[in-house]
């Protein structure tokens, strides 16, 4: 944003606010830089934990905001963003269940809604200029509200460290509980928590136990496995151990159960959208169980070509979500096309939790294509094995013709 624009065009800004060091400094910085504009703080409750939200309204006002909106998005996040995404089979680079990525579209959408409500002419985020989130947020803003100005302080101000931010707040007598000794950058929601920075920036360093917060170390997990019974309807878990739960509450319970057995840890070096590689340690205990349960029922109900197609859709969807392209026609098309397959995912699964693993050990579905009568290795009355001969001749016909014409030499 140009210097001329700063003084004249920005009157009211809605800031994506967490109460952390960065956004606490952004509030006074915005007022100083943008001609004493009004700042409205917005916080999305996506299941990051009540301790993260405690005292947030008071803290925002004390930092200079005129108001602070805390919007509960937990159920919507799980029902309308997480479930549709995992129904496509989306996993980024084979391991990452897209915990941070899936939360960004709903946060950006809610931020735009608050901006419309209060009559703001700009939105602001605290994402760094090196990360993926700046692209995700601003891509969503462009799709939903291209008329709103976007302010990204980390691409404008001269502060480069936590010490700089602490000094900035101290000079303005703004209190903060943050310190310069924070080791890791963390981002949490109902689905997962990410850990980056500190000694993790060297991929030769093994994560210490101090990194992990949602899961116990697998080697310290109980020596006795735990079995969790799940019921699924149209690709969503509706009951856990016989108890009917909302999507969000089911996920929270599974987080507790799986986390106690060390399930859901990954340590990866991923390709960021902005071109560099980054190392992240992620914990997704409940999500790992949910993903395993859905895949178990899919094995029963999806035919071969449907599963192959779904794998292609999942790969494409993973990149769309990771790259911040949720509000696009292609994303909408993939989600819509995947729904008929998700609607077949009905049944029951028993998941075994043990020493970091979540394994589906029992599964059944009213939509199952599996038939024990046809699949048995014993004697049966429903399958004539001689029928396979004609199938094999036709299946291998092109290979036979190629060989007869001498093209295999």
Swiss-Prot record:
Q: Which residues does the annotation say bind L-aspartate?
A: 128, 132-133
Which example biological process does GO assign this protein?
urea cycle
- SUPFAM superfamilies listed in its UniProt record: Adenine nucleotide alpha hydrolases-like (SSF52402), Argininosuccinate synthetase, C-terminal domain (SSF69864)
EC number, UniProt record: 6.3.4.5
The record's Pfam families line, in alphabetical order, gives: Arginosuc_syn_C, Arginosuc_synth
Q: Name one GO molecular function term.
A: argininosuccinate synthase activity
Q: Where does L-citrulline bind?
A: 96, 101, 132, 136, 185, 194, 270, 282
What are the entry keywords?
Amino-acid biosynthesis, Arginine biosynthesis, ATP-binding, Cytoplasm, Ligase, Nucleotide-binding
Q: In which pathway does it act?
A: Amino-acid biosynthesis; L-arginine biosynthesis; L-arginine from L-ornithine and carbamoyl phosphate: step 2/3
**Entry's Gene3D superfamilies?**
Argininosuccinate synthetase, chain A, domain 2 (3.90.1260.10), HUPs (3.40.50.620), Single helix bin (1.20.5.470)
Q: What is its main location?
A: cytoplasm
Entry's family note: Belongs to the argininosuccinate synthase family. Type 1 subfamily.
Oligomer and partners: Homotetramer.
The record's listing under NCBIfam families reads:
argG (TIGR00032), PRK00509.1 (NF001770)
What's the protein name?
Argininosuccinate synthase
* Lineage of the organism: Bacteria, Pseudomonadati, Pseudomonadota, Gammaproteobacteria, Alteromonadales
